[in-house]
Amino acid sequence: MKPLRKERLQQAIKQELSKILLEDMNDERLKFVTITDVELSDDQKYLKVYFSTMPGKNSEQILQSLERVKGYVSGEVARTLRLRFAPEIKFELDNSIERGVRMVKLLEDLEKKDEVKEDESHEDESTDHTEETNEEP
């Protein structure tokens, strides 16, 4: 399959999966799922689906719910997008968003610590300078 066609098909699958999970599923936990990426094999028989969920939601329960509905989801994707095969889906939790949020927080904390150190060093310099000017010759 040509790379551009594959990329377009993966985008269409990602949109369709999101729509199915939001509109067709009765399990409320699946309403909190975001499809972050999909990888379709060249023969279109296998589909790896990466998802994330809101912090505080039980990822393992959500993964189990996704596993229960993957046959239906696969069939709907194949039917809607007119694929030759209903791809075998494998769901994987994508922690990259969580890791990104943690990384941003760490960087912000480091920045705050640097600001505090700079403020302290400026205070020390001004204190040293004040002491020097108050000394008698």
From Swiss-Prot:
<dbReference type="Pfam" id="PF02033">
    <property type="entry name" value="RBFA"/>
</dbReference>
<dbReference type="GO" id="GO:0005829">
    <property type="term" value="C:cytosol"/>
</dbReference>
<comment type="similarity">
    <text>Belongs to the RbfA family.</text>
</comment>
<dbReference type="GO" id="GO:0043024">
    <property type="term" value="F:ribosomal small subunit binding"/>
</dbReference>
<keyword id="KW-0690">Ribosome biogenesis</keyword>
<dbReference type="InterPro" id="IPR015946">
    <property type="entry name" value="KH_dom-like_a/b"/>
</dbReference>
<dbReference type="InterPro" id="IPR020053">
    <property type="entry name" value="Ribosome-bd_factorA_CS"/>
</dbReference>
<dbReference type="InterPro" id="IPR023799">
    <property type="entry name" value="RbfA_dom_sf"/>
</dbReference>
<comment type="subunit">
    <text>Monomer. Binds 30S ribosomal subunits, but not 50S ribosomal subunits or 70S ribosomes.</text>
</comment>
<keyword id="KW-0963">Cytoplasm</keyword>
<dbReference type="GO" id="GO:0030490">
    <property type="term" value="P:maturation of SSU-rRNA"/>
</dbReference>
<comment type="function">
    <text>One of several proteins that assist in the late maturation steps of the functional core of the 30S ribosomal subunit. Associates with free 30S ribosomal subunits (but not with 30S subunits that are part of 70S ribosomes or polysomes). Required for efficient processing of 16S rRNA. May interact with the 5'-terminal helix region of 16S rRNA.</text>
</comment>
<feature type="compositionally biased region" description="Basic and acidic residues">
    <location>
        <begin position="127"/>
        <end position="137"/>
    </location>
</feature>
<protein>
    <recommendedName>
        <fullName>Ribosome-binding factor A</fullName>
    </recommendedName>
</protein>
<dbReference type="InterPro" id="IPR000238">
    <property type="entry name" value="RbfA"/>
</dbReference>
<feature type="region of interest" description="Disordered">
    <location>
        <begin position="112"/>
        <end position="137"/>
    </location>
</feature>
